[in-house]
């Protein structure tokens, strides 16, 4: 039993909508890939929200952005996060915290996930200091007003958002 638990703790899930993926997300993924032998970046379909980018596009942008990292896989999911984590035989949910304002929501989420399964722990990482203010929402707003987002997102995301703006 102990070996199974240890194996589960070797695999982490970093879930999010990544709408779009930002350099803050990339920083967390890159650093987490050096901590965990296996990291699954789990892209939520988020049927309750109206995502700016399609689920397939978000997955593709992430694969292009982190595909070079050893031990990192990008997978879409559309079920309850804790169920997805257990299906993947993972023992860690990795979450990013940018500011104190993120903490309250993330604390509640971690508590709920622990209540749903005691086999899974939630760990938090903060992005590098110069990336803490970046959010997908702010990136979308800047892009919608034709602002320069190149310092906030990977180049493939810049191209995708420009393409999207030209279609509108």
Curated annotation (Swiss-Prot):
Binding site for ATP: 17-18, 25, 96-98, 106, 131-137
Cofactor(s) for this UniProt protein: Mg(2+)
Main location: cytoplasm
EC number of this enzyme: 2.7.7.3
Reactions the enzyme catalyzes: (R)-4'-phosphopantetheine + ATP + H(+) = 3'-dephospho-CoA + diphosphate
Annotated pathway: Cofactor biosynthesis; coenzyme A biosynthesis; CoA from (R)-pantothenate: step 4/5
Family classification: Belongs to the bacterial CoaD family.
Stated role: Reversibly transfers an adenylyl group from ATP to 4'-phosphopantetheine, yielding dephospho-CoA (dPCoA) and pyrophosphate.
Protein name: Phosphopantetheine adenylyltransferase
Taxonomic placement: Bacteria, Pseudomonadati, Pseudomonadota, Gammaproteobacteria, Legionellales
């Amino acid at each position: 039993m102990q070996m199974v638990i240890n194996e589960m703790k070797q695999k982490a899930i970093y879930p999010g909508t990544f709408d779009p993926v930002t350099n803050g997300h990339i920083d967390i993924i890159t650093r987490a890939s050096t901590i965990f032998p296996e990291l699954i970046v789990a892209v939520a379909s988020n049927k309750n929200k109206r995502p700016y980018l399609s689920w397939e596009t978000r997955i593709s942008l992430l694969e292009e952005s982190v595909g070079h990292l050893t031990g990192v896989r990008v997978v879409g999911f559309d079920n309850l996060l804790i169920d997805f984590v257990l299906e993947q035989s993972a023992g860690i949910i990795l979450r990013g915290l940018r500011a104190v304002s993120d903490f309250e929501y993330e604390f509640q989420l971690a508590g709920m996930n622990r209540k749903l399964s005691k086999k899974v722990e939630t760990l938090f990482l903060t992005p590098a200091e110069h990336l803490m203010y970046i959010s997908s929402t702010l990136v979308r707003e800047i892009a919608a007003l034709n602002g320069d987002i190149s310092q906030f997102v990977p180049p493939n995301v810049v191209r995708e958002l420009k393409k999207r703006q030209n279609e509108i």
